[in-house]
Amino acid sequence: MPKYRSATTTHGRNMAGARALWRATGMTDADFGKPIIAVVNSFTQFVPGHVHLRDLGKLVAEQIEASGGVAKEFNTIAVDDGIAMGHGGMLYSLPSRELIADSVEYMVNAHCADAMVCISNCDKITPGMLMAALRLNIPAIFVSGGPMEAGKTKLSDQIIKLDLIDAMIQGANPKVSDEDSNQIERSACPTCGSCSGMFTANSMNCLTEALGLSQPGNGSLLATHADRKALFLNAGKRIVELTKRYYEQNDDSALPRSIATKAAFENAMMLDIAMGGSTNTVLHLLAAAQEGEVDFTMADIDRLSRQIPHLCKVAPSTQKYHMEDVHRAGGVIGILGELDRAGLLNRQVKNVLGLDLLQTLNQYDVMQTVDESVKEMYSAGPAGIRTTQAFSQDCRWPSLDTDRVEGCIRDIEHAYSRDGGLAVLFGNLAIDGCIVKTAGVDEGSLTFRGPAKVYESQEDAVDAILGGKVVAGDVVVIRYEGPKGGPGMQEMLYPTTYLKSVGLGKSCALITDGRFSGGTSGLSIGHVSPEAANGGLIGLVQDGDIIDIDIPLRKIRLDVDERILATRKEVEFARGDKSWTPKARERQVSLALRAYASLATSADKGAVRDKSKLGG
């Protein structure tokens, strides 16, 4: 029988000092035999996806204490990728994932907490907490802040849906008037919550649900809707049940590694491919799998990407649907239901509610449930009122979207495409693989051949695009932006956005060892591995070199003679200490970022730390 971890600090005369300090936090004698449960919040006023979380930790804590536990809340940092985008701040985004994971470990282990509820939402916060949960392997439940309502505005006598990406594209489009650009900007992000499309934050919250570590509805129920409150209240009650099951009944099925198994990771990846999730999810799933000692690799992702069709199309791949529409159609469970009916899912998985996949689908799939309360939950809709308050409205759709032929979520026979929304490409330019969000690629661009325009920073590429130096047919190559070379693996949202702004979104390709925002669409290929800073071939590409891209065949190739490449490699190594570094880039890199770069692996490993460099 496992012993409560917290007993280390609450039992025995040698812990009198620790108990004295616990008493100063409000604990009493009656509390010293109870499980201590960490409420891991990520409230910050910097991030719209987190601005409403201040009081939600208290909701969870009250339920924990009412159920027989002791709740202790702490906060992590949270970087807003959209605000950090397009300048040096983006260097800090991906490294913050590791910092969040470490800080959760530090707090939970330093204070011997028995379990935790993770209140996350945006891009690197959910992955960082997920890595920590699988690393620590103590009972854990995730409950996120929820998605933002889609923006809406009237242009040319037509009501259109909007999000952050529209504001960025139209803001740089010289054909859009100042008045219209200002109107779009003011309408794009109307409420608290994670940005309204299938961007990284919402993708990861959906995947956490598919992994079984959060409750049904977590990935899609709007931040503003009153129904979301129940997820927080139930998380507080349920974590105490899981904690007691593990420590008092020796039931390790309550642990994250027992829930997020290889089968669960495969289901989550199948969901990701089916819904055309952010390419960043590949990084984060690979990183989380390593923390949980799950043998889940790029080879698995490649295999699954060839089997799973595209069943759910959401912004930025279309402006017709946002997360509020996914929820109306049944959310994550609705998509999983269609995958299960096609015989594609692993059924031997469970979630934090203790339900296996079939039980979950029977109860929560809108296409088969008889539970009216579930149908009511999935009818939760937007109010269209600007607010930063959670649970501030209770509007409902007049009906659910159960149209699996032409609706937001499709059945297998009416898939948006037979190929899924993500693909792994291999070739001499990316021998360890690279990722493309096929859900956002125009059908006419699935194969592409063109000359390279090479840039060694995102900033130089942006200047070239806006300065008219990139033309139709070009393959824009941005290198030395990987985990090590950046450092920090910046998102290339501005280059892809500005290609659209200048009318080149469908006539150019972009390849990088950096990564892309979940808001990216178009022929944008990222995570090229090995990266330039690790001696990858992308570091040898020169202007005018021809690059072949074939998404249906999963190939990417630099069409340059091997003898020429060998000569270029010799020249590069001849640079000595400066080899495999940018030739002309001025960038201030802090000590913190240099420390991250010194241990960073390439994207095919999840950009996690290279443990071989740490010894032991």
From Swiss-Prot:
Lineage: Bacteria, Pseudomonadati, Pseudomonadota, Gammaproteobacteria, Enterobacterales
UniProt: [2Fe-2S] cluster binding residues: C122, C195
Positions contributing to Mg(2+) binding: D81, D123, K124, E491
One Pfam family per UniProt: ILVD_EDD_N
Protein name: Dihydroxy-acid dehydratase
KW Lyase (keyword) present: yes
Pathways per UniProt: Amino-acid biosynthesis; L-isoleucine biosynthesis; L-isoleucine from 2-oxobutanoate: step 3/4; Amino-acid biosynthesis; L-valine biosynthesis; L-valine from pyruvate: step 3/4
The UniProt record lists the keyword Metal-binding: yes
Keyword annotations from UniProtKB, A to Z: 2Fe-2S, Amino-acid biosynthesis, Branched-chain amino acid biosynthesis, Iron, Iron-sulfur, Lyase, Magnesium, Metal-binding
GO molecular function, one term: dihydroxy-acid dehydratase activity
Gene3D superfamilies according to UniProt: IlvD/EDD C-terminal domain-like
EC primary class: lyase
SUPFAM superfamilies reported in the protein's UniProt record: IlvD/EDD N-terminal domain-like (SSF143975), LeuD/IlvD-like (SSF52016)
Residues at the active site: S517
Cellular-component GO terms for this entry: cytosol
Reactions accelerated catalytically: (2R)-2,3-dihydroxy-3-methylbutanoate = 3-methyl-2-oxobutanoate + H2O; (2R,3R)-2,3-dihydroxy-3-methylpentanoate = (S)-3-methyl-2-oxopentanoate + H2O
Residues modified as N6-carboxylysine: K124
Record's subunit section: Homodimer.
Disulfide bonds: none
Species per Swiss-Prot/TrEMBL record: Photorhabdus laumondii subsp. laumondii (strain DSM 15139 / CIP 105565 / TT01)
Record HAMAP family: IlvD
Co-factor binding comment: Binds 1 [2Fe-2S] cluster per subunit. This cluster acts as a Lewis acid cofactor.
